[in-house]
Amino acid sequence: MLEVKFYDSVDDSLLKFAVIISQSNGKWVFCKHKERDTYEVPGGHREADENILETAKRELQEETGAIKFDIKPVCVYSVTGKTRVNDTGEESFGGLYFAEISEFAKELHSEMEKVVLMDELPDNWTYPLIQPKLIEKYLQIERQTYSKIQLAAKQTIEYIKKVIKPEINLLEIRKLCEEKMLELGADSFWYWNVGAFVFAGDETTISVSDKSGLRD
Protein backbone atom coordinates (compact mmCIF):
# COMPACT_ATOMS: atom_id res chain seq x y z
CA MET A 1 0.00 0.00 0.00
CA LEU A 2 1.34 3.42 -0.92
CA GLU A 3 1.42 6.24 1.61
CA VAL A 4 1.38 9.86 0.46
CA LYS A 5 2.48 12.62 2.83
CA PHE A 6 2.88 16.38 2.51
CA TYR A 7 5.46 18.81 3.87
CA ASP A 8 6.00 22.55 3.72
CA SER A 9 9.64 21.95 2.83
CA VAL A 10 12.48 19.41 3.00
CA ASP A 11 16.17 19.54 2.22
CA ASP A 12 16.56 20.34 -1.47
CA SER A 13 18.80 17.32 -2.04
CA LEU A 14 15.87 15.01 -1.20
CA LEU A 15 13.67 16.31 -4.02
CA LYS A 16 13.91 13.79 -6.86
CA PHE A 17 10.65 14.44 -8.74
CA ALA A 18 8.42 17.30 -9.82
CA VAL A 19 4.68 17.03 -10.48
CA ILE A 20 2.83 19.93 -12.06
CA ILE A 21 -0.93 20.18 -11.61
CA SER A 22 -2.06 22.30 -14.54
CA GLN A 23 -5.07 24.16 -15.88
CA SER A 24 -5.80 26.09 -19.04
CA ASN A 25 -8.87 28.30 -19.48
CA GLY A 26 -10.49 26.75 -16.43
CA LYS A 27 -9.93 23.14 -17.54
CA TRP A 28 -7.63 20.51 -16.06
CA VAL A 29 -4.64 19.57 -18.20
CA PHE A 30 -3.84 15.85 -18.45
CA CYS A 31 -1.42 13.83 -20.55
CA LYS A 32 -1.93 10.45 -22.21
CA HIS A 33 1.20 8.35 -22.66
CA LYS A 34 1.68 6.60 -26.01
CA GLU A 35 1.88 3.20 -24.30
CA ARG A 36 -0.99 3.63 -21.84
CA ASP A 37 -4.75 4.16 -21.91
CA THR A 38 -4.75 6.23 -18.74
CA TYR A 39 -4.29 9.89 -17.90
CA GLU A 40 -1.69 11.59 -15.74
CA VAL A 41 -0.57 14.94 -14.43
CA PRO A 42 2.70 16.06 -16.07
CA GLY A 43 5.84 15.38 -14.07
CA GLY A 44 9.09 13.49 -13.94
CA HIS A 45 12.59 12.95 -12.59
CA ARG A 46 14.98 15.70 -11.63
CA GLU A 47 18.16 15.78 -13.69
CA ALA A 48 21.60 16.17 -12.13
CA ASP A 49 22.18 19.79 -13.12
CA GLU A 50 18.68 21.10 -12.29
CA ASN A 51 17.03 22.77 -9.37
CA ILE A 52 13.56 21.42 -8.73
CA LEU A 53 11.77 24.40 -10.31
CA GLU A 54 13.76 23.89 -13.50
CA THR A 55 12.66 20.25 -13.45
CA ALA A 56 9.03 21.31 -13.13
CA LYS A 57 9.27 23.77 -16.02
CA ARG A 58 11.07 21.29 -18.27
CA GLU A 59 8.64 18.45 -17.59
CA LEU A 60 5.67 20.74 -18.13
CA GLN A 61 7.04 21.92 -21.47
CA GLU A 62 8.05 18.44 -22.63
CA GLU A 63 4.88 16.62 -21.65
CA THR A 64 2.22 19.23 -22.43
CA GLY A 65 3.89 21.39 -25.05
CA ALA A 66 3.29 24.44 -22.86
CA ILE A 67 4.86 27.56 -24.37
CA LYS A 68 3.44 30.29 -22.16
CA PHE A 69 2.60 29.55 -18.55
CA ASP A 70 2.76 30.79 -14.96
CA ILE A 71 4.01 28.29 -12.41
CA LYS A 72 4.13 28.36 -8.62
CA PRO A 73 5.13 25.91 -5.86
CA VAL A 74 2.37 24.25 -3.85
CA CYS A 75 4.21 22.07 -1.33
CA VAL A 76 6.46 19.02 -1.02
CA TYR A 77 4.97 15.54 -1.26
CA SER A 78 6.39 12.12 -0.50
CA VAL A 79 5.46 8.58 -1.47
CA THR A 80 6.38 5.52 0.58
CA GLY A 81 5.97 2.13 -1.08
CA LYS A 82 7.09 0.43 -4.25
CA THR A 83 6.11 2.03 -7.55
CA ARG A 84 7.28 1.79 -11.16
CA VAL A 85 9.84 4.51 -10.40
CA ASN A 86 10.78 3.40 -6.86
CA ASP A 87 11.62 -0.28 -6.47
CA THR A 88 12.96 0.07 -2.90
CA GLY A 89 9.72 1.29 -1.36
CA GLU A 90 11.57 3.88 0.70
CA GLU A 91 10.09 7.34 1.16
CA SER A 92 10.81 9.49 -1.89
CA PHE A 93 10.21 13.22 -2.15
CA GLY A 94 9.03 15.53 -4.90
CA GLY A 95 8.06 19.13 -5.47
CA LEU A 96 4.39 19.77 -6.21
CA TYR A 97 3.64 22.73 -8.47
CA PHE A 98 0.66 24.40 -10.10
CA ALA A 99 0.77 25.92 -13.58
CA GLU A 100 -1.70 28.01 -15.54
CA ILE A 101 -1.00 27.41 -19.23
CA SER A 102 -1.99 30.11 -21.73
CA GLU A 103 -0.41 28.72 -24.90
CA PHE A 104 0.53 25.25 -26.21
CA ALA A 105 2.83 24.16 -29.01
CA LYS A 106 1.08 22.70 -32.05
CA GLU A 107 2.92 19.36 -31.75
CA LEU A 108 4.27 17.24 -28.91
CA HIS A 109 7.82 15.90 -29.03
CA SER A 110 7.81 13.49 -26.11
CA GLU A 111 6.53 10.11 -24.99
CA MET A 112 3.06 11.64 -24.60
CA GLU A 113 0.52 10.84 -27.30
CA LYS A 114 -1.73 13.79 -26.56
CA VAL A 115 -2.78 16.44 -24.09
CA VAL A 116 -6.41 16.55 -23.00
CA LEU A 117 -8.28 19.44 -21.37
CA MET A 118 -10.97 18.19 -18.98
CA ASP A 119 -13.81 19.84 -17.10
CA GLU A 120 -13.71 17.06 -14.50
CA LEU A 121 -10.95 14.84 -13.15
CA PRO A 122 -10.55 11.52 -15.00
CA ASP A 123 -11.64 8.10 -13.78
CA ASN A 124 -8.75 6.21 -15.38
CA TRP A 125 -5.59 7.50 -13.70
CA THR A 126 -2.08 6.27 -14.45
CA TYR A 127 -1.22 6.76 -10.78
CA PRO A 128 -4.58 6.36 -9.00
CA LEU A 129 -3.08 6.02 -5.52
CA ILE A 130 -0.93 9.14 -5.81
CA GLN A 131 -2.06 11.87 -8.18
CA PRO A 132 -5.68 12.26 -7.00
CA LYS A 133 -4.26 12.92 -3.52
CA LEU A 134 -1.91 15.55 -4.92
CA ILE A 135 -4.79 17.39 -6.57
CA GLU A 136 -6.88 17.09 -3.40
CA LYS A 137 -4.03 18.70 -1.44
CA TYR A 138 -3.69 21.49 -4.00
CA LEU A 139 -7.42 22.25 -3.79
CA GLN A 140 -7.28 22.23 0.01
CA ILE A 141 -4.43 24.75 0.02
CA GLU A 142 -6.25 26.93 -2.52
CA ARG A 143 -9.37 27.01 -0.35
CA GLN A 144 -7.31 27.98 2.70
CA THR A 145 -5.52 30.69 0.73
CA TYR A 146 -8.79 32.08 -0.62
CA SER A 147 -10.27 32.24 2.89
CA LYS A 148 -7.17 34.10 4.07
CA ILE A 149 -7.49 36.56 1.19
CA GLN A 150 -11.18 37.10 1.95
CA LEU A 151 -10.46 37.95 5.57
CA ALA A 152 -7.59 40.28 4.66
CA ALA A 153 -9.78 41.91 2.00
CA LYS A 154 -12.59 42.65 4.43
CA GLN A 155 -10.13 44.09 6.95
CA THR A 156 -8.56 46.22 4.21
CA ILE A 157 -11.93 47.58 3.10
CA GLU A 158 -12.77 48.57 6.68
CA TYR A 159 -9.38 50.26 6.95
CA ILE A 160 -9.86 52.19 3.69
CA LYS A 161 -13.32 53.32 4.73
CA LYS A 162 -11.77 54.90 7.83
CA VAL A 163 -8.84 56.66 6.15
CA ILE A 164 -10.29 57.64 2.77
CA LYS A 165 -10.70 61.36 2.11
CA PRO A 166 -12.27 63.22 -0.85
CA GLU A 167 -8.89 64.50 -2.05
CA ILE A 168 -7.32 61.02 -2.25
CA ASN A 169 -7.09 59.77 -5.83
CA LEU A 170 -7.43 56.18 -7.03
CA LEU A 171 -3.71 55.54 -7.30
CA GLU A 172 -3.23 56.61 -3.69
CA ILE A 173 -6.13 54.39 -2.62
CA ARG A 174 -4.65 51.48 -4.50
CA LYS A 175 -1.28 52.00 -2.83
CA LEU A 176 -2.94 52.07 0.60
CA CYS A 177 -4.82 48.87 -0.22
CA GLU A 178 -1.73 47.05 -1.43
CA GLU A 179 0.25 48.08 1.64
CA LYS A 180 -2.53 46.94 3.97
CA MET A 181 -3.01 43.61 2.18
CA LEU A 182 0.71 42.91 2.36
CA GLU A 183 0.73 43.88 6.03
CA LEU A 184 -2.04 41.32 6.60
CA GLY A 185 -0.08 38.63 4.78
CA ALA A 186 -2.20 38.36 1.62
CA ASP A 187 -0.02 37.80 -1.45
CA SER A 188 -2.88 37.94 -3.98
CA PHE A 189 -5.87 40.22 -4.11
CA TRP A 190 -8.74 41.51 -6.19
CA TYR A 191 -8.02 44.83 -7.79
CA TRP A 192 -10.10 47.44 -9.58
CA ASN A 193 -10.41 49.07 -12.96
CA VAL A 194 -10.93 52.83 -12.77
CA GLY A 195 -13.41 53.62 -10.10
CA ALA A 196 -13.91 50.79 -7.65
CA PHE A 197 -11.82 48.41 -5.67
CA VAL A 198 -12.94 44.83 -5.30
CA PHE A 199 -11.68 42.34 -2.77
CA ALA A 200 -12.74 38.70 -2.71
CA GLY A 201 -16.23 39.53 -3.89
CA ASP A 202 -16.71 42.66 -1.77
CA GLU A 203 -16.92 45.98 -3.61
CA THR A 204 -16.70 49.55 -2.41
CA THR A 205 -17.75 51.82 -5.25
CA ILE A 206 -16.20 55.23 -5.80
CA SER A 207 -17.70 55.62 -9.27
CA VAL A 208 -19.01 53.30 -11.98
CA SER A 209 -16.47 50.59 -12.64
CA ASP A 210 -15.83 47.14 -14.02
CA LYS A 211 -14.46 44.30 -11.93
CA SER A 212 -11.07 42.86 -12.68
CA GLY A 213 -9.70 39.49 -11.70
CA LEU A 214 -7.06 38.01 -9.45
CA ARG A 215 -3.55 39.32 -9.73
CA ASP A 216 -0.43 37.68 -8.32
Language model features with spans:
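Conserved hydrophobic "DFG−1" position in protein kinase catalytic cores
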Residues: 20-22, 30, 99, 200
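Short glycine-rich loop/turn motifs
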Residues: 17-19, 28, 193-196
